[in-house]
UniProtKB/Swiss-Prot annotation:
The keyword Cytoplasm applies. It comes from Xenopus laevis (African clawed frog). Belongs to the selenoprotein S family. One of its GO terms (biological process) is endoplasmic reticulum unfolded protein response. Residues 136-147 have a biased composition (Low complexity). Residues 116-125 have a biased composition (Basic and acidic residues). GO terms for cellular component: Derlin-1 retrotranslocation complex; Derlin-1-VIMP complex. Pfam families: Selenoprotein_S. This is Selenoprotein S B. It comes from the Eukaryota. It is found in: Endoplasmic reticulum membrane; Cytoplasm. The keyword Cytoplasm applies. Involved in the degradation process of misfolded endoplasmic reticulum (ER) luminal proteins. Participates in the transfer of misfolded proteins from the ER to the cytosol, where they are destroyed by the proteasome in a ubiquitin-dependent manner.
Length: 188
């Protein structure tokens, strides 16, 4: 018996050789077609792993220091409480100023209403702004309780005014619009 010609062992090297050639052809073809994409993907994955591992170690280190240091936790809580107290004091001061302004505005409004009522009782204009104009001019009349009659004025429009007919005078009169396109061009 020969060692190299046994019936079960003779086919094995040929099958391994065919498998090796098949694998080499398949991998070689994939690398020749997609080699640059594979290389670029590996580089991107490498940098992502580096970035994520750095972030992960930083996060783990920060959680260790915050959890293990109770004095720091107490100091932070006290600082937060002090900041809240300071903001609350400021808010209370602003609310107090707002209330004072509202009271002043209400008092001013009440005073104006009283002045308007008094002026209406005297027969004067109810407008407060008119009072400033009247106070600026010296009063010649001794009887201020009797209002002066208004002078006769002509009507603003004629009694037969109709804007559709254009008979009211003036330079502008209504005219119906033209039919057709508003801008030039052929309508062909």
């Amino acid at each position: 018996m020969e060692l190299g010609n046994q019936p079960g062992q003779g086919n094995r090297p040929e099958i391994e050789l065919e498998w090796y050639q098949y694998l080499q052809n398949t991998v070689g073809e994939a690398l020749s077609n997609y080699g640059w994409y594979i290389l670029l993907g590996c580089i991107v994955i490498y940098f992502l792993i580096q970035k994520l591992s750095a972030n992960f170690t930083r996060a783990v280190a920060s959680t260790r220091t915050t959890v293990t240091d109770p004095d720091e936790i107490v100091r932070r809580q006290e600082a937060v409480a002090a900041a809240r107290m300071r903001m609350q004091v400021e808010l209370n001061a602003q609310a107090e100023l707002y209330k004072q302004k509202q009271v002043q505005l209400q008092e001013e409004k009440r005073r104006r209403n009283i002045e308007t009522w008094d002026r209406m009782q005297e027969g004067k204009s109810s407008k407060v702004g008119c009072r400033l104009v009247q106070d600026a001019s010296p009063r010649t009349s001794t009887s201020s309780s009797a209002p002066k009659p208004k002078p006769e004025s002509r009507p603003l429009r004629d009694s037969g005014y109709n804007p559709l007919t254009g008979g009211g005078g003036g330079t502008c009169a209504w005219r119906p619009g033209r039919r057709g396109p508003s801008s030039g061009g052929s309508u062909g």
